[in-house]
A protein has these predicted regions:
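Surface-exposed cleft-lining segments at the edges of enzyme active sites
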Residues: 116-124
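An amphipathic alpha-helix signature
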Residues: 25-37, 72-80, 152
């Protein structure tokens, strides 16, 4: 990557920033709930079925080092326990400890987990303003990089599916720590203007802000319950559509250029 000092670098998160991964997860989770209900012969009485399942989901994630990337079979087991009448936190705790007696066999649980992954592989929908925003940034000569903690191959596949792969010079896979941004910027020529666009305040905005980037918060549909408040993180900008990004990036670049000539 050969950068120029006056070239803006824009890091962009993938899931729930470029495309709506949350909707795919919701579809997968509701299908999992229905399969567990069918297997044990019980249904939740909760009016909001997705909220019922996601309470269990987040309780499991809080206990696992990979957070929301914990093995889905744990969700199958905890959901069965919750359908037996205990609350989501208690069900997650019991499934995590192990040693429980389940109605679903290991083969049944494995089949539900397999179908969960199959549904999770469905193509996501692109988020509002993404194509317009990326086109404008590309035409302005910005260096565009995807940064993700997910699997690079899956991000590449989804970028092709929604038609945005051609805008990005590189997909960077790794933990979103401040050091990652600093290291990449050293290769791009440490431009005066560097930005991060993301939907997660703790995973996208905070580390980028610590590294000195301008941060653009593009809220998605789902925020885990451990997410800090916007007022605590204080992103530089908050947008409702990705097509707002070019005005922010290019406006800041013009302001910097004017200041350097003063």
């Amino acid at each position: 990557m050969n950068g120029r000092l006056d070239r803006a670098t824009v890091f962009v998160d993938a899931d729930n920033t470029l495309w709506d991964t949350d909707a795919v997860f919701a579809e997968s989770q509701l299908a999992l709930l229905e399969a567990v209900e069918a297997g044990v012969g019980r249904r939740t009485a909760a009016a909001d079925r997705l909220a019922f399942l996601r309470a269990i989901d987040q309780a499991l994630a809080e206990r696992h080092h990979a957070r929301l990337r914990y093995p889905p079979r744990l969700l199958v087991r905890a959901t069965e326990l919750a359908l037996g009448g205990i609350d989501g936190d208690s069900a997650a705790r019991a499934a995590w400890r192990g040693g429980q007696t389940y109605r679903l066999s290991d083969d049944q649980a494995g089949d539900i987990e397999r179908r969960f992954f199959e549904t999770l592989a469905h193509a996501p929908e692109i988020r509002p303003g993404v194509l317009i925003g990326l086109s404008a940034l590309e035409q302005a000569g910005c260096l565009l990089l995807i940064v993700t903690e997910g699997a690079k191959a899956k991000v590449e596949r989804n970028a092709e599916r929604v038609g945005v792969a051609q805008f990005f010079e590189r997909i960077i896979e790794g933990p979103k720590a401040p050091e990652l941004y600093r290291r990449v910027l050293s290769f791009t020529g440490a431009p005066a203007r560097a930005f991060m666009v993301g939907d997660q305040l703790d995973r996208d905005i905070t580390p980028a802000k610590t590294a000195g980037l301008r941060t653009i918060f593009f809220p998605g549909g789902f925020q885990p319950r451990w997410t800090p408040a916007v007022e605590q993180v204080r992103p530089d900008y908050t947008i409702a559509s990705f097509d707002e990004v070019p005005d922010i990036v290019l406006g800041q670049r013009r302001a910097t250029a004017a200041g350097s000539k003063a």
